[in-house]
């Protein structure tokens, strides 16, 4: 079973939990053999709800003693069995897409209701709902292979892919999804959203440090990857959010369009 985010990852992206023992069954305080070990120890830290697996009725067992919930659940690891599965913000028919999992990626299930499973993505701890029929036994589905040494080359291979909010390369891709996917295939684990990446990916570059291929360049609500010192590859929303795609264009052109210009540069490689 894949472990949830480590303590180091919590510090970087605001994830709310550390690795826990997998028993694959839910339990409340009445049946929890560890119940006496869990006590709240003061005001809880501010936690990013995107990566904190808690609802009004239950939470991941690793949050016991950190956040209160009526029930704590040990997650079950499942794997995506279809080409891609949409992660949604609820189990309703009008739910919005927040991310996407690709074939073989792991999803930690905390609850099943109707046709949906609620839990979090094993690779980045992102919470949400997945269609239950997109998941299968992780023991029978191999995890995606790391097949690239250069994340920039991976991003170039996605040129022309349509922009899709919440996409990671299945039905489409968004700016932070492009960054996360490109670096993941080269063995670098990054957070899901651009603000999380701005807080955690690699190290911040100083104003006196020269740009280099593979650097991440951040704007207000946007991120791209330097192809070279003057050129950016990124998933652009297009004009008014229409016709967006993964494109290569001069950094200066992106700066001219984005209010506030470049807000941050980080280096992972």
Enumerate the predicted regions with their spans.
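A generic structural signal for residues embedded in beta-strands
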Residues: 80, 109, 218-219
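Short, structured beta-strand/loop micro-motifs enriched in basic residues and often containing a Trp
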Residues: 82-92, 132, 137, 194-205
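Short, well-ordered loop/turn sites that connect or cap secondary structure elements
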Residues: 95, 101, 205, 210-211, ...
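Aromatic- and glycine-rich peptidoglycan recognition patches
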Residues: 4-7, 141-148, 152, 168, ...
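Residue-level recognition of beta-strand termini and adjacent short loop/turns
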Residues: 113-114, 228
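Catalytic cysteine-centered active-site loop
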Residues: 163-211
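Catalytic nucleophile-His microenvironment captured as a short glycine-rich beta-strand/loop
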Residues: 216, 221-231
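Boundary regions of SH3-family modules and the immediately adjacent low-complexity/disordered segments
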Residues: 2-76, 92, 99, 103-108, ...
């Amino acid at each position: 079973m894949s472990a949830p985010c480590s303590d180091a990852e919590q510090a970087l992206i605001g994830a709310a939990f550390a690795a826990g023992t997998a028993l694959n069954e839910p339990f409340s305080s009445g049946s929890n053999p560890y119940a006496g070990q869990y006590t709240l120890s003061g005001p809880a830290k501010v936690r990013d709800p995107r990566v904190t697996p808690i609802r009004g009725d239950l939470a991941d067992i690793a949050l016991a003693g950190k956040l209160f919930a009526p029930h704590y659940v040990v997650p079950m690891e499942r794997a995506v069995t279809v080409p891609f599965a949409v992660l949604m913000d609820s189990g309703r028919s009008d739910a919005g897409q927040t991310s996407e999992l690709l074939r073989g990626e792991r999803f930690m299930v905390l609850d099943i209701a109707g046709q949906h499973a609620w839990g979090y993505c094993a690779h980045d701890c992102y919470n949400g709902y997945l269609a239950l029929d997109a998941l299968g036994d992780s023991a029978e589905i191999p995890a995606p292979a790391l097949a690239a040494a250069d994340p920039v080359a991976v991003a170039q291979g996605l040129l022309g892919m349509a922009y899709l909010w919440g996409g990671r390369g299945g039905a489409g891709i968004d700016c932070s999804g492009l960054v996360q996917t490109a670096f993941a295939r080269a063995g670098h684990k990054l957070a899901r959203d651009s603000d999380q990446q701005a807080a955690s990916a690699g190290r911040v570059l100083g104003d006196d440090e020269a740009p280099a291929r593979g650097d991440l360049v951040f704007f207000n609500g946007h991120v791209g990857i330097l192809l070279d010192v003057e050129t950016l590859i990124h998933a652009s929303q297009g004009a008014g959010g229409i016709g967006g795609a993964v494109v290569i264009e001069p950094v200066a052109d992106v700066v001219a369009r984005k209010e506030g210009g470049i807000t941050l540069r980080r280096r992972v490689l």
